[in-house]
Amino acid sequence: MAHKKAGGSSRNGRDSNSKRLGVKRFGGELIPAGSIIIRQRGTRVHPGENVGMGKDHTLFAKVDGRVNFTVKGLPQRKTVSIIPA
Protein backbone atom coordinates (compact mmCIF):
# COMPACT_ATOMS: atom_id res chain seq x y z
CA MET A 1 0.00 0.00 0.00
CA ALA A 2 2.48 2.61 -1.18
CA HIS A 3 -0.15 5.30 -1.62
CA LYS A 4 0.05 8.86 -0.37
CA LYS A 5 -3.14 10.30 1.08
CA ALA A 6 -4.43 13.44 -0.68
CA GLY A 7 -3.07 16.71 0.72
CA GLY A 8 -5.23 19.72 1.48
CA SER A 9 -6.15 22.12 -1.29
CA SER A 10 -3.75 24.97 -1.96
CA ARG A 11 -4.35 28.33 -0.31
CA ASN A 12 -3.20 30.10 -3.46
CA GLY A 13 -4.89 30.24 -6.84
CA ARG A 14 -6.86 33.50 -6.63
CA ASP A 15 -6.37 36.90 -8.14
CA SER A 16 -8.51 40.01 -8.51
CA ASN A 17 -9.57 41.38 -11.88
CA SER A 18 -7.53 44.31 -13.16
CA LYS A 19 -9.27 47.67 -12.64
CA ARG A 20 -7.99 49.35 -15.85
CA LEU A 21 -6.78 52.47 -14.07
CA GLY A 22 -4.68 55.20 -15.65
CA VAL A 23 -4.73 58.06 -18.10
CA LYS A 24 -7.35 57.56 -20.82
CA ARG A 25 -6.88 60.85 -22.72
CA PHE A 26 -3.45 62.43 -23.07
CA GLY A 27 -2.25 66.05 -23.16
CA GLY A 28 -3.16 67.93 -26.33
CA GLU A 29 -6.06 65.63 -27.29
CA LEU A 30 -9.36 67.23 -28.31
CA ILE A 31 -12.18 65.59 -26.37
CA PRO A 32 -15.94 66.03 -25.97
CA ALA A 33 -17.63 66.93 -22.67
CA GLY A 34 -18.21 63.91 -20.43
CA SER A 35 -15.10 62.04 -21.59
CA ILE A 36 -13.13 60.23 -18.91
CA ILE A 37 -9.60 61.64 -18.70
CA ILE A 38 -8.13 59.61 -15.81
CA ARG A 39 -9.28 56.66 -13.71
CA GLN A 40 -7.41 56.61 -10.41
CA ARG A 41 -7.44 55.54 -6.77
CA GLY A 42 -7.25 58.68 -4.66
CA THR A 43 -6.32 62.10 -6.04
CA ARG A 44 -2.99 61.33 -7.73
CA VAL A 45 -4.01 64.02 -10.23
CA HIS A 46 -6.30 66.88 -9.17
CA PRO A 47 -9.07 68.44 -11.27
CA GLY A 48 -8.38 71.89 -12.74
CA GLU A 49 -10.48 74.19 -14.95
CA ASN A 50 -13.47 72.53 -16.63
CA VAL A 51 -12.70 69.12 -15.10
CA GLY A 52 -15.00 67.29 -12.69
CA MET A 53 -14.26 64.48 -10.25
CA GLY A 54 -16.50 61.45 -9.68
CA LYS A 55 -16.97 59.73 -6.33
CA ASP A 56 -14.31 57.14 -7.26
CA HIS A 57 -11.86 60.01 -8.08
CA THR A 58 -12.34 59.60 -11.84
CA LEU A 59 -11.57 62.86 -13.66
CA PHE A 60 -13.83 63.82 -16.57
CA ALA A 61 -14.25 66.74 -18.98
CA LYS A 62 -17.06 69.22 -18.25
CA VAL A 63 -16.71 70.99 -21.63
CA ASP A 64 -15.45 70.17 -25.13
CA GLY A 65 -11.80 71.11 -25.51
CA ARG A 66 -8.13 70.22 -25.33
CA VAL A 67 -6.57 68.28 -22.43
CA ASN A 68 -3.81 70.14 -20.57
CA PHE A 69 -1.67 68.65 -17.77
CA THR A 70 0.25 70.95 -15.39
CA VAL A 71 2.31 70.66 -12.22
CA LYS A 72 1.84 73.51 -9.75
CA GLY A 73 2.60 74.58 -6.21
CA LEU A 74 4.48 73.04 -3.35
CA PRO A 75 4.13 70.16 -2.88
CA GLN A 76 4.28 69.58 -6.64
CA ARG A 77 0.64 68.87 -7.45
CA LYS A 78 -0.42 67.43 -10.80
CA THR A 79 -3.58 68.94 -12.24
CA VAL A 80 -5.47 68.38 -15.46
CA SER A 81 -7.64 71.02 -17.07
CA ILE A 82 -9.58 71.45 -20.29
CA ILE A 83 -8.94 74.44 -22.54
CA PRO A 84 -12.28 75.06 -24.33
CA ALA A 85 -12.06 74.63 -28.10
Swiss-Prot record:
Keyword Transmembrane: no
Entry keyword Ribonucleoprotein: yes
BP terms from Gene Ontology: translation
Segments for region (Disordered): 1-24
A GO CC annotation given for this chain: cytosolic large ribosomal subunit
Pfam families: Ribosomal_L27
SUPFAM superfamilies: Ribosomal L27 protein-like (SSF110324)
Record keywords: Ribonucleoprotein, Ribosomal protein
PROSITE patterns recorded: RIBOSOMAL_L27
GO molecular function ontology, one term from the record: structural constituent of ribosome
Family: Belongs to the bacterial ribosomal protein bL27 family.
UniProt cross-references to HAMAP family, sorted A to Z: Ribosomal_bL27
PANTHER family in alphabetical order: LARGE RIBOSOMAL SUBUNIT PROTEIN BL27M, RIBOSOMAL PROTEIN L27
Name the record gives this protein: Large ribosomal subunit protein bL27
